[in-house]
UniProtKB/Swiss-Prot annotation:
PROSITE patterns: BRO1
Domain named BRO1: residues: 1-427
Organism: Caenorhabditis elegans
Signal peptide from the UniProt entry: none
Domain of life: Eukaryota
Phylogenetic lineage: Eukaryota, Metazoa, Ecdysozoa, Nematoda, Chromadorea
Designated name of the protein: BRO1 domain-containing protein BROX homolog
């Protein structure tokens, strides 16, 4: 069996010393910078393994952001709130003092750099969001997936989507961030990450609805919404180069057609229960057609260029079960229609309900955590800018040197078929 979720590489970055020398006029200032160096290095290392403990990685992530807050905003009191838009927070005087270099998930050969601490903060939040999606995949890949694992998978995807949204909303802080096509700050790429996390969270809900045997109409509608979100994600990447983005796009396309197949399958089942056999025949035939396209996309995905994991979703039980399900429904609809109903089979494709009013995945809004207790007005004032080298205020630019890719641990995936009725490991 193969992974159900495609995953792009984690962002690489250059080691940061936080060596501000004469700017640090007190032991507390030096301690903050020394701790930032250690915490950053540990956090970046944690991102290499998707199976690391969620609570531990989240704690390390929040502690780093809290300690880093004084490099983002002026510390006016020990209880300053970074997210309070009405508090009149000013940018920190420390923003331009350190140069940060980060790579991009989809452009392994292109690193960007700038002397701006918001570049560091937003890049780190992106990294955490990417790790959360990978952790979700590791939860879905266990030999035995319990309900708590499925909930953690859903939680991670919702949190990741909220973080991606936060980065997109705050990216206007960075001059030139959106000028590097295909970078992680390209608006098209950021929106694709948001939509992909949303669609994959929706997948968990669809699987749960199937497993719990909810109303066929509801399942059809949820699957149709999921297909629509995957399609929107794919369309965001329309004009980006195939050599970097083809594999990601084929993944989004196969998921789009796969969930259309499920939507038509359950629409057909609903119509059968309502004695609308002619319409059920048409829905099942359309579902079979969509499944055929999904298989074609899976084959194209296998040879597509671009970074990231190479998965085989067509070998997954959840994928394999849809074809016999459609065939059973079609055979029953045709048989009953031939014997009893004699209804005309419509030529037009049935309309799917994409207006589901409940059961939809909502992203968890991300809020930057408050500054660490180490920060107060006296500590902030003790960073002496008169001792700093002249900052570089230029906008983000491509780095002349490359960054090595992150050597990530392989995400474990069970070889066992799920024992549940839906065939989905995340139900």
């Amino acid at each position: 069996m193969s992974h159900w979720f495609h995953r792009n590489p984690i962002k690489p970055t250059e080691f940061v010393k936080f060596d501000l020398k004469g700017v640090l006029t007190t032991d507390t200032c030096s301690k903050i910078c020394g701790e930032l160096r250690l915490r950053r290095d540990k956090l970046v290392s944690q991102f290499k393994n998707a199976s690391n403990d969620l609570e531990e990685v989240t704690k390390e992530f929040n502690e780093y952001l809290r300690l880093f807050a004084g490099f983002l905003i002026e510390i006016q009191s020990s209880m300053v709130e970074l997210e309070n838009k009405d508090a009149g927070n000013k940018n920190s005087k420390l923003i331009p003092l350190i140069r940060f270099k980060w790579g991009n998930s989809m452009l392994p050969q292109a690193a960007t750099e700038v002397s701006d601490t918001w570049f560091e903060a937003l890049s780190m939040i992106q990294c955490m969001a990417m790790w959360l999606t990978k952790h979700a995949a590791s939860m879905a890949g266990k030999d035995e997936v319990r309900e708590s694992d499925a909930k953690e998978c859903l939680q991670c995807l919702r949190q990741a989507g909220g973080m991606f949204q936060y980065v997109k909303d705050e990216s206007s802080r960075l001059s030139g961030a959106n000028e590097v096509e295909g970078s992680d700050f390209d608006p098209k790429v950021m929106e694709t990450y948001i939509l992909t996390a949303t669609a994959e969270a929706q997948e968990v809900i669809v699987a749960r609805a199937i497993e719990m045997k909810h109303d066929d109409g509801l399942i059809s509608s949820l699957a149709a919404v999921t297909a629509s979100i995957f399609s929107k994600a794919d369309q965001c990447l329309n004009n980006l180069p195939d050599e970097s983005f083809a594999r990601w796009r084929r993944y989004l396309q196969l998921k789009h057609h796969f969930y259309l197949a499920y939507a038509f399958a359950f629409l057909g089942q609903k119509q059968l229960s309502e004695d609308k056999c002619g319409e059920a025949v048409r829905a099942c035939k359309q579902g079979i057609a969509e499944y055929g396209v999904a298989k074609e996309m899976a084959a194209m995905y296998a040879t597509a260029t671009g970074p990231g994991t190479r998965i085989k979703p067509e070998q997954h039980l959840f994928f394999r079960r849809i074809e016999p399900l459609l065939n059973r429904h079609l055979e029953k609809a045709e048989r009953e229609n031939g014997f009893i109903y004699h209804q005309k089979v419509p030529d037009e494709i049935p309309q799917l309900d994409v207006e589901a009013t409940y059961g939809l995945a909502k992203l968890d809004s991300f809020t930057y955590p408050p500054p660490a207790e180490s920060w107060n007005t006296a500590v902030y004032s003790a960073f002496d800018l008169s001792k700093a080298n002249m900052p570089d205020f230029s906008k983000i630019k491509k780095s002349k040197s490359k960054l090595d890719p992150v050597h990530e641990e392989k995400i474990y995936q069970t070889e066992k078929d799920p024992s549940n009725s839906s065939g989905c490991v995340i139900a």
